[in-house]
Amino acid sequence: MPLPFEQFQGKGVLGFLDSSSSPGYKIWANPEKLHGRVEEDLCFVVNNGGFSEPTSVLDSVRSPSPFVSSSTTTLSSSHGGPSGGGAAAATFSGADGKCDQMGFEDLDGVLSGGSPGQEQSIFRLIMAGDVVDPGSEFVGFDIGSGSDPVIDNPNPLFGYGFPFQNAPEEEKFQISINPNPGFFSDPPSSPPAKRLNSGQPGSQHLQWVFPFSDPGHESHDPFLTPPKIAGEDQNDQDQSAVIIDQLFSAAAELTTNGGDNNPVLAQGILARLNHNLNNNNDDTNNNPKPPFHRAASYITEALHSLLQDSSLSPPSLSPPQNLIFRIAAYRAFSETSPFLQFVNFTANQTILESFEGFDRIHIVDFDIGYGGQWASLIQELAGKRNRSSSAPSLKITAFASPSTVSDEFELRFTEENLRSFAGETGVSFEIELLNMEILLNPTYWPLSLFRSSEKEAIAVNLPISSMVSGYLPLILRFLKQISPNVVVCSDRSCDRNNDAPFPNGVINALQYYTSLLESLDSGNLNNAEAATSIERFCVQPSIQKLLTNRYRWMERSPPWRSLFGQCGFTPVTLSQTAETQAEYLLQRNPMRGFHLEKRQSSSPSLVLCWQRKELVTVSAWKC
């Protein structure tokens, strides 16, 4: 029976995952258990360079059975009883490292705030902007079958609200962003090891090991001139120039080889920068800082976390309540900016067009998030089933690289809500969660990843921002083997400078996120808390992830489009329907300044821009 949200207010974590009583969490904070082992995004190493045994279903896979999770939902599945709907999020039991099972009905009740008799799925809350009323009218998202649209929004799902939005001030949770980067290991039978970025001097126990040979490039040139960002007047230009120079210098000191004083110099630069950003931008009159200064502040924090080498510390626990706030921020971002819906709907339209005539659909997703992208796809398949009494079955294989308990909790949460949503719509559905590390060695590639019959179509969702650049060739090698019908990629301008030194990448990130924050400010959000939530739970972690990945992989690598071409992939022109749908999406959005560009260069793509500044690009590829 769903538990009311009030029962959980004021607690450190949700009642059924209380860190004060659950020994499962203590394994992550126990220095004895953590000594000699650091978990990585893709794998982990130990002091002697060997591999430790996995203690979680999402730990590194070392056996021929690399499954994280596999579940199936069909029309006949039961979603309330222990056999059908009892999805589980994993918590760690301290003794054996195995996962305890926890029901999601409780969390769903917490998030929806509804009574036991009220059908309110949190997945509907997440996807209020992506799932639409089947009765709405729209000329897009049609693959020739007269299917209903997916982006028109007089939607009853918007009627649901988060019960915690108006919580009393004293009862609101205190949230902290806990970036948890890790290290890369060299799996069995992988290519030769790569030169390391050793981080702080004196860090001798933990080695950063990479699976590629050194191409012969120096990792950076700290004396390159940073690009400039113009302000509104001469004073703003002068202030911006100082901030850019300080960020560039701090990044250069972080990455200069040799010299034990470099971290000290970087720390001093960042301290002065933080002081200048705070003194020059007084928001005592409730005037928010300009986007440029906010972006600079977030980047300063990210560089400081790299300076502190927080990756060597035990991972900080992220309470399950953080998931609630991240979902709220995700929804606010989706409702405010066309960014997420543009990416999701354009990708889904391209995927649907590649699936016509197939009985089975297999999605390989490298960034499943909360699963929201697939809500409209599931709804479209349900619509086809209602029109023709038959529809393709859907399977999703999600590659994940969780590094904390909360990540695994989030994945299980996503899995359960996708299964429940598919069950409600009557779509035959399977989902499998796999550790991304298995792709580093073909020995561990499960047969379930390959096409099972000629009637099965495979599509890949590959956001470039979800990849560490050095691992992209290995991912493409795997994709070449499964021969997908289409690979849909989304990327941002800050994802394309892997051939530039790290300091230049920092300035490129500053430019990009300044534009993104400017676009969000143009929406004039009436809810200041929503604006703060978007930046705290969407923008700031994105900056941290971008710079952490760049810092971990210093070697310059070719542009990702060049790698696609070298691996045998060719670009595909996006359809007129996809373009029309994207145009309509922008027309519906109340925010002005966004526009669409269609590029027909070496790789045709649709580009979402704001004030002629590129925000995100979607392209399609085939092999």
From Swiss-Prot:
Recorded consequence of changing S305T: In strain: cv. cv. Ag-0, cv. Bay-0, cv. C24, cv. Ct-0, cv. Cvi-0, cv. Kas-2, cv. Mrk-0, cv. Ms-0, cv. Mt-0, cv. Nok-3, cv. Oy-0, cv. Sorbo, cv. Wa-1, cv. Wei-0 and cv. Wt-5
Region VHIID: start-end pairs: 330-398
Highest taxon above the source species: Eukaryota
Alphabetized GO MF terms: DNA-binding transcription factor activity
Motif VHIID mapped to chain: 361-365
Stretches the record annotates as SAW: 548-622
Protein name stated in the entry: Scarecrow-like protein 22
Source organism of this protein record: Arabidopsis thaliana (Mouse-ear cress)
